[in-house]
Amino acid sequence: MQNWKRSFMICEIIIFSDREKGIMLMILKPIQRKDKQNRTVTLRSADVSDAEALLRYLKVTSGETPFLIREPDEIKLTLEQEEAFIRSKMEEPGELLLIGEIDGKQVGNCSVMSMGSFKRYAHRCEIAIALYQEYCGAGIGKMMMETALQEAKKMGYEQAELEVISDNANAIALYEKMGFKKYGTFPNSMKYSDGRYADAEFMMKIL
């Protein structure tokens, strides 16, 4: 069996209950897996010290692909604002901000987000993921998605949802392999500066 397919190491998870919402607050301590190039990938929850690197990640990835919602010049968060955002993710039940690292460098980010505070939405979560282009195709996105979905189930979610641009064939193929199914198309979801439009696919997976 290839190294990148081996089971990941035992992970230590700190879980706190939120009795009112019925979902869990989770901090994922570092776990390690091998990618297709036999590089060690560390997966862990983000903390406040990651703010600067996350801001850089947002600016770079938004310029590398047409499949994200923001242009690079729209990333205007200050370091303090990003620190506050990370802190809120650490403290909010039902949220996980997962970072992937190789040799101490952030290579990707995957988030588990609640769909809102309403009790009738408490069974649903949203997944979002992006990697630096140079690290795509090495199995890192898959391992991050697998980890995020496992933790989402542990937090009490019953289904995971995501939105993906219709032209993003590689991402859609990965999501379908992981059990996501399309349930709708949103025409003209995004409009680019050159006047082109892009549709989006809504996808969902039962956990």
Residue ranges, per PLM feature:
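Conserved catalytic-core motifs of GNAT/GCN5-like acyltransferases
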Residues: 161-164, 176, 181-196
